[in-house]
């Protein structure tokens, strides 16, 4: 563009795309019934005293590392947390690292942390690389 006043200059810029890597984090929660007091582990139903396992899966589908990842889940509902049932890992099927129920100790950085505070489950990861995930599983008894 040609300036119309002396001392002014202008330039037109278009069609520029900035490609900055970014993290794209998603959270999925799934459940499966492990057993109930009537059917045991054979075709269990969601009835009182059934044991249900939940998995919180946190995934990064972006092109950059996500840092200081925190996922929380409220345990409000007609169920009771099963103490000592928390496990962490890279996916729901293989989450086997034992997590205690408190927010202290070496299990909080192994490489994932998890704890129960009041009625909230919190899962943490210092970082989550592109195309990776971490999972936290825990169990509840239906009231």
List where the protein language model places each region.
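Exported/extracytosolic protein signature
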Residues: 1-143
């Amino acid at each position: 563009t040609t300036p119309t006043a002396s001392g002014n200059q202008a330039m037109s810029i278009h069609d520029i795309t900035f490609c900055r890597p970014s993290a794209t984090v998603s959270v999925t929660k799934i459940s499966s019934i492990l057993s109930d007091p009537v059917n045991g582990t054979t075709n269990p139903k969601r009835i009182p005293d059934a044991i249900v396992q939940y998995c919180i899966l946190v995934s990064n589908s972006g092109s950059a590392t996500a840092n200081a990842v925190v996922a929380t889940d409220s345990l409000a509902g007609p169920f009771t947390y099963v103490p000592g049932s928390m496990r962490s890992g890279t996916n729901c099927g293989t989450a086997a690292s034992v997590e205690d129920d408190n927010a202290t100790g070496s299990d909080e950085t192994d490489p994932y942390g998890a704890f129960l505070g009041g009625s909230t489950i919190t899962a943490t990861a210092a970082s989550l690389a592109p195309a990776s995930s971490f999972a936290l599983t825990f169990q509840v008894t239906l009231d």
